[in-house]
């Protein structure tokens, strides 16, 4: 009798969980999708779904084929010869886990029914903010749990067994017998072995269930993933996911995925692998064999790769548009039967026109020796150029060629002519070899994102400390290879001293980024005039553009423009101060001396539509873009050169007279080193 009661109770709880799961999926759909989007999703799903015992579901092959992801099988196979892009199993593992939300304990991995797919699309696109209580923090846990495959049973076996068991259990059975439950036992790692962070984890699911009057059922038997922090992501799994994200980073809404995943040349794949290796090198070396833990994963993504998962949004939004959907037939049928209903809009036969995405790299100028599609994708994972749409691919940012040492020469005069006249944000890139005692050459790529023009080095607007920093207004210093390193800009610009500009330019000492500039005086000689490292990191380039010094100090050099690695600008000043001493004992303090091969500056031009400003009456203000402003500055300099030549001729043309004329021009600030100084005021 006791056994019967136990069985009945378990079946009742299982039924309650499945009922809640369906209700939650309906709530997700109503809250996160437009009616037409939901109609497209239904058509896409049910037109391809398999049927077993009345259950409609997708398997891995259908999912990979629809998304256009290589998986080593089916039509998307053999996209690359080395199999590095075979991310189908990884994506299928993720959706099988996320489809069980918030019942990963007893339902993951789940069969990909329509209800499961609804939750997957919400959680893997930017719609997740409408249903997750703490937004990115909650999503981080879910993404990690969906990828974790170390410390679990064989993941592929579990997925196959789960699908078979769940489908077979739907068949006819004797209601008096102890039939198999309609849900599987889940991953071993999801069994509630411990209660660490229990309240925090429960909140994640309770936030989704609080409107369904189901919290007590959840607390009774469906505790969410208490051991997610004990599981890990294997390096192979993370490598395949990174490869897919790097390749598909430029994917536009409703764009063809196969355009990026097929036909890749060996040099293109090698460039992708270089960026993948760089990101993996940022992890603790000990995790290479044991797997990536939650803390390392969360820290890496939140502090230096905040936009890593952005490509998943356009990828899974493909499910929200069907080329085969024709609602006109349904509308005609309803009219014929005499049914009254609201007019149903007929979707177009082609994807709806989204704002055209301009090429990320503008044509003309010079051919880059540094930038390539893989490196550009890497940059898009952490560089923000717009407050509303941070991702450089999605906000239609242009990269305009401003300066190249290969094209324009290794000269500070040429650098100042091209860069100091660029009145817009820019990205500095340096490619070279690390100078070391070993004979083996190690190439490195470093750079900086500078949201303000070079001349306005100390003109950052003051901001109250209580306001959240906007990443698009903060500079960042970074290393792209061989080890991914990002030093975020400090949000406390108002507290920095005037001798600590973001950028400093001098024909005598060269280029300095994130340094303290010593005051010039008649008693200062030699090294006393050179910029000094400050804050979490600095970059110095000599006046010949031949050598660079990249310093990462973890804050040992006091306050500065950049934060130590692993710290996000969103941290409060209190938590930042407390975290610096603990990080200073790490091994991330280093100085790299670099022999420069190529130095490039790329100007950032925001989309015209995003940059439009309105006057008081609501009319658009005519603006001149950075390219026009630069050309106007060059024209002005040309006229000034002619005027200086005319002055010299009027003086008399003699050598002494020419020197006198030059002295007058220098005192007027028209020529000379002070003209190019970041501290000069016009």
Curated annotation (Swiss-Prot):
Keywords: Cytoplasm. It holds the Pfam family TLD. Its main location: cytoplasm. GO terms for cellular component: cytoplasm. Residues 344-357 have a biased composition (Pro residues). Coiled coil: none annotated. Residues 166-200, 331-357 are annotated as: Disordered. May be involved in a process influencing telomere capping. Belongs to the RTC5 family. This is Restriction of telomere capping protein 5. The lineage of its organism: Eukaryota, Fungi, Dikarya, Ascomycota, Pezizomycotina.
